[in-house]
Regions:
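Conserved pre-motif I regulatory segment
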Residues: 1-44, 54, 61, 181
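Conserved structural elements of the adenylate-forming
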Residues: 58-66
């Protein structure tokens, strides 16, 4: 099987091919079609087998498709996504939310958060979708600024996520996709 046979959207397929990947790994071949059908999965595979792509590619596909549907549904005179007015803390002052977080990937360490963020950069570079990683051990301000600009996909460690939810910097009411990466490791950490 090839990535082309998985019916991946052209912008994502182009990015995957640019990375030099033609054939999915076993976890990708098993997981991607299931997630693309909107089903939940529980995946276990060794390190280095492509687990991140197994969830990143279908998430990108779903969000890209939803964006295309939203654009097609807008009146012809306003074919740009509406931007709600926001106050200094990034809160919306209009009826329409702009770039609400729709996917959350929770991971135990900053190193994993950065690796996952890099994968979304690589596979999503032609989609127009925005993503960022938030994690502790660094100043919050640069991370909250990225959040205020709007992100579709958030990669986070539990501690920083809880901090920013408590400060009303992260809102998850528009979430459609949730991934626990390395869930066993997070449970071991408490």
């Amino acid at each position: 099987m090839t990535f082309n046979e998985l019916n991946i959207a052209e912008p994502i397929l182009r990015a995957v091919c640019e990375k030099g990947y033609n054939e999915p790994t076993p976890i990708q071949e098993q997981a991607i079609p299931v997630v693309l059908r909107g089903k939940d999965i529980f995946g276990i595979a060794q390190t280095g087998t492509g687990k991140t792509a197994a969830f990143a590619i279908p998430i990108l596909q779903h969000l890209l498709k939803k964006n295309e549907q939203n654009i097609a549904a807008e009146p012809a005179s306003t074919n740009e996504p509406g931007r709600a007015r926001r106050n200094r803390r990034g809160r919306s002052h209009g009826k329409k939310e702009y770039r609400a977080i729709r996917a959350l990937i929770l991971t135990p360490t900053r190193e994993l958060a950065l690796q996952i963020n890099d994968c979304f950069t690589d596979y999503g570079k032609y989609t127009g979708l925005r993503h960022t990683a938030i994690f502790g051990g660094v100043k919050q301000h640069p991370q909250t600024e990225k959040l205020r600009q709007g992100v579709d996909i958030l990669i986070a460690t539990p501690g920083r996520l809880l901090d920013l939810i408590g400060q009303d910097e992260v809102r998850l009411e528009s979430l459609t996709h949730f991934v626990l990466d390395e869930a066993d490791r997070m449970l071991d950490m408490g």
